[in-house]
Amino acid sequence: RRLRFFILLFAASSLLFHPPFDFEANATDAWYNDSWEYRKKITASLDTVISSDLTDFPYLVSFTDSDLTKTTESDGTDIVFTASDGTTELAYEIERFDQSTGEVIAWVKIPTVSASDNTDIYLYYKGTATSSSSSVWDSSYKLVWHLNQTSTGTVDEFTDVSDTGNDGTGGGTGDITQDADRRPTQVEAKIGYGQSFDGPTQSGGSEGSGDFIWSQDVSNWPGNNGSTSDNDTTIEFWAK
């Protein structure tokens, strides 16, 4: 069945969790690869944020550093993240990079984020062009929208970066008449770009009159089980 999503809040990303961290340019651990000239050590101190260790957690790295203007590639594709040993590459996704300012927004899948001790990772840059890993968001994520696109009503314009492929379209499509006036608007958000949704998005069980994003392929969502009947689905956003 096609399921219509009416999203009621301004969201900077499908998941926002931005723990405090410190970083340093000089470090003494082993080097990832001689093709990379620089690295920064990022230290997460989460003892006041989480009560137990997190496993395979997509950790948000977001900061601006003029040193990153030295990247080899203007889109940041020479950036690589490693574990605390300095050599084990971690799965990561670069959501946004601005070489002119050194701004980077990335999601790094850390095997264990400690609740009682510092967790260190490294960011390497000015090296060989590579590509982000798609394995940050595994099959347990049914949808991950960063909501950083400009909505034009193009089908599947809001890309689902998980393996599930539940892309979305601003203002409707399919069995919903496309309405340019009901597309969300791209804005500068807490983390990179986000979407502003105008007005109530549901009224009396109908579509209502507000902005929304529509997604068609939800047959593999929890509770659906291939049924032809509608099923309740909860979407949760974390924001800070």
At which residue positions do the language-model features occur?
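Extracellular and analogous surface-interaction loops
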Residues: 43-50, 219, 237-240
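Sec-dependent, cleavable N-terminal signal peptides
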Residues: 1-29
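Solvent-exposed strand-to-loop "edge" motifs in beta-rich extracellular domains
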Residues: 64, 147-150, 232, 238-240
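Short, ordered beta-strand-loop transition motifs
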Residues: 95-103, 182-192
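Short, tryptophan-glycine- and acidic/Ser/Thr-enriched carbohydrate-recognition patches
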Residues: 147-182, 197, 212
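Alpha-mannosidase-like glycoside hydrolase catalytic domains involved in N-glycan trimming
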Residues: 23-149, 161
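Short surface loop/edge beta-strand patches of beta-sandwich-type extracellular domains
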Residues: 110, 196-234
